Amino acid sequence: MMFWSSKTGITSKYSFSSSPTFTAEPWSIYTGRPKSSSSSSPSKVSIFMFDKKQFENYLLHYGIIKSKSGSRDKVLIQEAYEILRNQANNLAKLKHPNILTLIEPLEEHSKNFMFVTEFVTSSLETVFRETDDEEQNFLQGHVKDNIVVQRGILQLVNALDFVHNRASFVHLNIQPRAIFINENSDWKISGLGYLVKIPPGTNTSEYFLPQYDPRVPPFMHLQLNYTAPEIVFENTLTFKNDYFSLGLLIYFLYTGKDLFRSENSTSEYKLEYNKFESKISTMSWDNIFSKVPQKLRHCIPKLINRDIYSRYDNITLILDSEFFQDPLVKTLNFLDDLPTKNNEEKYVFLEGLVNLLPEFPPALLQKKFLPILLELLSQFCAEKVVSDKCVGKSLDLIIKIGSTLSQLSFQEKVYPVLLSDANFPVLLKKATICLIDNLDTLKQKVKRSDFLENILKPLFNYVLHDSESDITVVCQEKLLSQIPLALEVLDFPTVKQFLLPLLSNLFTKTTSLTVKNTCVTCFQIMIEHKSIDSYTCSETVLPLFKSMKTRDPRILSKLLKLFETVPLIITDEIVLVDQVLPLMWNYSMASTLTKSQYSGYTKAINKMSSDIQKHHIAKLDDKVNDIGEDAFHKVIEPTIMKKEDPETVAAKNIEVAAMQPVKKKTGSSYGETLPQSKSILNSKPLNPKNALATRGFPTRILNSPPQTPSSRTGSKVMTKGGSNDASSTKVEEEFNEFQSFSSTGSIRQTSAPSDVWMNSTPSPTPTSASSTNLPPGFSISLQPNKRKDGSSDIPRSNVYGSLI
């Protein structure tokens, strides 16, 4: 729906749809919304708009006027505009619940007239006029309900009573287009353009109809189809003119047709009325008004009798009819006056309303009752001394009516009022039982997340933990009976972390046996629904009963049922034997049990014990069978020896220690003799297990004794550059020698500190008789020795700690 607005007057305050919601000649009615967010402003309004340009073009098109500037033509145009002004201005003068409420006065612009009223959804013309549009009839069907029509007629009578007896006006325009219906199904009188005041001290006056021109729009003259004959025939003005119009309107409401079809011609009207009188003389009133309810039918002659003195003397006399004595109608009347009543009267009314609700149409309950009751609830909650019974009863009615709404409508209309910061804390304390009783409806009508977080959890927390009122025990019992509903909403973590602690704490601390008994039932339900697991049951639930002191047979009987359900989630034999069976034996020996109760315990104990034994024996049988099958297969299966490669096995057993650096000593020089390492001859031989097989390689036998540093210095060597040559490049190395290790011990061979190339064959590595020969390319691992400070720079490649 498109909304538009301008910058001045009504259009600056309201935005409204680009197309009208409906039309009521001569006005187009738009649905508008205030731009301001003030709490006092209505959420929706109706904007009545008349297109002056379209009207003037219509007059020109049909030759009613020759030009817009002609003096005679201007008079005609202004007469029409004066009728429109009267319609809006008289609304401002007459204030009554059954007269259309004016919100913004008439604004005159160059292109249009407009004014703002309370929000209306339709007129009687659009709702009750007989049509072949089935969809339209279905959508408006609730407005045609008997009780709605009964009440609507009553509201029209009340409005006419005000206009006649208080304001001394004759309406003269009671017709379907002049009666509007608001969203609460209330009927509102409008069309006050022909309002005429009766002179003081008299009940009659004269009224002359203007000359009829069939070309002019209908709003410029009285609608003759709903005009009393004394005006047309005798020009007599009286309050009873409106009685006749009301009778014709009643006929329209129950038939969807006009009783007269005069085409707004006085001559046609006289013909139509003569036909009507002839029907009356040949047929009874009951036949002509057969569709009008029997209780109302006898009122018709007193409304539309040709003789004005045969009509009701006062419009209020019709209210004595049995038609208006219906309890439902009286209920609706009292509902309108409800804000003026005291709390005691309100409570009596609300209590009686509970029984009458099913007799009202759901649409009327939703549109009429619900807004009033929501407002009433907020008033009750805002009082300094809150009435528990008034709050509870009004909440109960609201939820019952809300159950007829869709979830979306309930969430939009009811939920915000109930869960407001001002109302919900009061409802928790003052209407606790009502909330509990209606949890199922709230669960269906409120979004799952909102219901869980904003209704269910606060309610459980308050009732099971915080409540200290006189009815706490009753509330706890009622709420605990709703555990199955709660488990449908709560997930496993919430049950474990929120609900179970509340129940456990309540079971431990409550002094009420019935509450304690109900807690046991809740635990049983949670086990049956598998809302808790075996660990939670064994660690949280079962320990509660170990410390329980009471041995009342009622709670012991409840516990027996719980114990019988425990194996549903606890299948561990050890837990059953260690925790469940001892509790059952303990409780079974209570002296408070009767013989039958004791027998129940013994049967349960024997059954659980038997089940445990059977299960355990089955486990043992499975184990023996498994062992037997394995042994049989081992006997019949041939032994397969896996072939292994000796070299692979030997390679896996080689252990070589890592090379370890030896730091140089401060102040040493290559001229000094390094301390001798242990002789390789004195070292432990290699572990034969770690020796690698040398299949396919020649064995290298080293028989020469190790060469000591002293013998090495005496051998003939060839120098590469002088050892004291200052120009020689010094190589700063942290380590210049290596220390050799084997897997069985550390062997360090130190070379002479001289920068020489040895020209003699290196001495072979010593070995002992028990040592294992190594294959070619293998030797004891090399380890670096730190050089001493002051030694000459010797390339690392020239000095070795051990020889291959």
UniProtKB/Swiss-Prot annotation:
Feature: compositional bias, Low complexity: 760-776
Protein name: Protein kinase-like protein SCY1
Note: Present with 1480 molecules/cell in log phase SD medium.
CDD domains from the UniProt entry: PK_SCY1_like
UniProt feature, compositional bias: Polar residues: 667-685, 701-729, 744-759
Native source species: Saccharomyces cerevisiae (strain ATCC 204508 / S288c)
SUPFAM superfamilies, per the entry: ARM repeat, Protein kinase-like (PK-like)
Domain Protein kinase: 1-324
